[in-house]
Amino acid sequence: VLVVAHPGHELTLAGWLTTVGPSVFVMTDGSGQLGRSRLHSTTKGLLNAGARPGSIYGDFSDRQVYEAMLKHDVDLFLRATFELADWIVLDDVDYVVGDSAEGYNPMHDVCRIIIGGAVELATRLRGRPIGNYEYVVTGRRDHCIAGRCAGTIRLRLDDAALERKVADALAYPELAGEVDAAIRRDGIEASRYECLHPVDNRMSWTPAEGGKPHYEEHGESRVASGKYQRSVRYAEHIAPLYAAFWENISECLDAPAASRMVGASSLQMGGRQIRPS
């Protein structure tokens, strides 16, 4: 299973997608501030690669998830976690791959805890370990390119596969400009290597003392320019969201009976019931 925050992230793992043909969960529709989904471009690419959409596929707009963060609405993210855990168990998944938490975009970071929570729940339900891997979304990939990643799943694309990967990325209309800029900055060879790094289920990104995540600085500039009314902040929004999320997951794991029910109005596992706001 591959789990990404936004459509288009899968382009980074084009070789792995073609090799494995996983189910792909896309949390948001990629509509951004303009409100235009780019999900159809991802669907076309997945089908060409032999992959398939998962049960969560652009279910939320970017506006919805940011509003949930601002309102501390952990229920939205818990619902996604339970649904992903359900799929992992029913599809007998061996390992899950997803966005890394880098402090770049809050949804990337929240996607990481959704994956971690789902893997923990699915492991409890199934009774055997499930692998959890991340890949670099926006950060530096120097160690991957140099082959210095410890304990990773590492793919090196041949020339034909690399050419297809780059061509497909440039043909993704909504992201072609970003792809072209990345190629000019890093070179085509940077796309040859695809590395999946094992990660702890409860891993989360935290800023250095006195520092701010990229998304906080970006949000502040948007507020100052009048484009946003409020911006997502780590200490005010994301850290409390993490705490509430893991409190709920821990209660589920600590419950005496491992039962789960998913419905339109409630989620339950081990007797813990969460009602959507």
What residue ranges belong to the model's regions?
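Metal-dependent de-N-acetylase/amidase catalytic core
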Residues: 1, 78-277
